[in-house]
Design a protein with these regions (language model features):
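Exposed substrate/partner-binding surface patches
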Residues: 2-23, 44, 53, 57-63, ...
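Glycine- and acidic
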Residues: 21-25, 98-101
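Short N-terminal secondary-structure initiator segments
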Residues: 22, 26-45, 127-140
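Generic detector of ordered secondary-structure context
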Residues: 27, 32, 63, 67-70, ...
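Active-site nucleophilic cysteine motif
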Residues: 28-43, 70, 104-115, 289-292, ...
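Carboxylate-rich, divalent-cation-coordinating active-site regions
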Residues: 35, 174, 244
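Papain-like cysteine protease catalytic cores
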Residues: 46, 50-186
Length: 331
């Protein structure tokens, strides 16, 4: 028998059978300025592939998997009918990683997401399969690719890599247009610039990949001398969940972000994949004080989560000009 719960807000007095199926619907207790954490967790837990993977591993048999075990316990509580969850233990675990999470001050949601995923990755090292994708054929690129593979991906092998971790390719280009060096870096959230002439997410992704001049020189093997150079950053691999954030310095002044329900990677990369908007985080406030909430798609309905409270919303009310972090899921 499924869980029966009342959805408050725009559809009050209606009751919905939420069942035991993914994704789960629940509120999170605000422990004191922890809306940044609650909204982040709502979006992360809306990643169905992650939840299904965690449920299929023997978490409780491994005491080292503290964060994964806490997620498992929370999901078990939801299955038993709880629709109000206390995330204190998750906060305490991350407080041992980052001291600021021991306290009750407002923090940045995008930073929390990065730290949460990195800590979960450490715990899940060696658990599940990891598939290497898009190995380059060019020898210079392949050498740089394998360097990151050995340094990061092979040392953190886990199913979490394909879900949340992508690769950036950085080309170091001299003033005469020669590629002097190539480096690969990993990412789990992509922090985008916000140019004054556009607020469209696809435009921001294009600007992110433009050449950026560096006030320095680099040795160019082709020119056989030190040359001024620029760096071109390319989005090389995109994981199953593509997390996009606005730069911290610009979220207080922009006029509203435009983002599609379906994001096509061919519009900003050489790859052709489609991603569907899975959830996103909203911030209303200024640098000193504000409130984070989340909107998530669950069972073909959209919900707005504000800590312990949540409500179902109409599809034409999904878009929000105050969105600052977007979660896209590969279709």
């Amino acid at each position: 028998m499924g869980i029966i719960c009342e959805i408050v807000g725009s559809c009050c007095n209606k009751r919905y059978n939420l069942g035991y199926n993914y994704p789960f619907i629940f509120g999170l207790k605000n422990l004191g300025n922890t809306c940044f954490m609650n909204s982040s967790l709502q979006c992360i837990f809306n990643s169905n592939k992650l939840i299904k993977k965690l449920e299929n591993i023997h978490i409780k048999k491994n005491p080292k998997l503290r964060l994964a075990n806490e997620i498992s316990l929370m999901l078990n509580d939801i299955k038993k009918g709880q629709i109000f969850i206390d995330p204190k233990n998750i906060k305490d675990i991350l407080g041992e990683v980052e001291e600021k999470y021991k306290y009750f001050e407002q923090n940045d949601a995008n930073e929390f997401i990065t730290i949460f995923l990195n800590e979960l990755l450490k715990e899940l090292n060696g658990i599940g399969e990891y598939k290497t994708e898009n190995i380059p054929k060019d020898e210079l690129e392949k050498k740089a690719f394998n360097k990151l593979e050995d340094k990061f991906f092979n040392k953190n092998k886990s199913f979490l890599l394909n879900l949340f971790y992508g690769r950036l390719k950085r080309q170091y280009i001299c003033e005469n247009g020669h590629i002097c060096a190539i480096k690969f870096n990993n990412f789990n959230t992509l922090i985008l610039p916000h140019p004054e002439d556009s607020n469209d997410i696809v435009d921001l992704l294009k600007v992110y990949q433009k050449n950026k001049s560096i006030d320095d020189t680099i040795f160019c093997n082709t020119c056989q001398s030190e040359k001024k150079y620029s760096i071109k950053t390319l989005i090389y691999n995109i994981p199953d969940y593509f997390i996009l954030c606005l730069e911290k310095e610009t979220i207080y002044s922009y006029s509203g972000l435009k983002y599609p329900k379906i994001l096509e990677t061919k519009d900003f990369t050489n790859n052709s994949s489609k991603y569907s908007l899975n959830s996103f985080i909203i911030y209303i406030g200024d640098r000193e004080r504000g409130h984070y909430t989340a909107k998530c798609e669950k069972n073909n309905n959209w919900y707005h989560f504000s800590d312990a409270n949540y409500k179902i919303i109409e599809e034409n009310n999904i878009h929000d000009k105050n969105a600052i972090i977007l979660f896209y899921e590969k279709i």
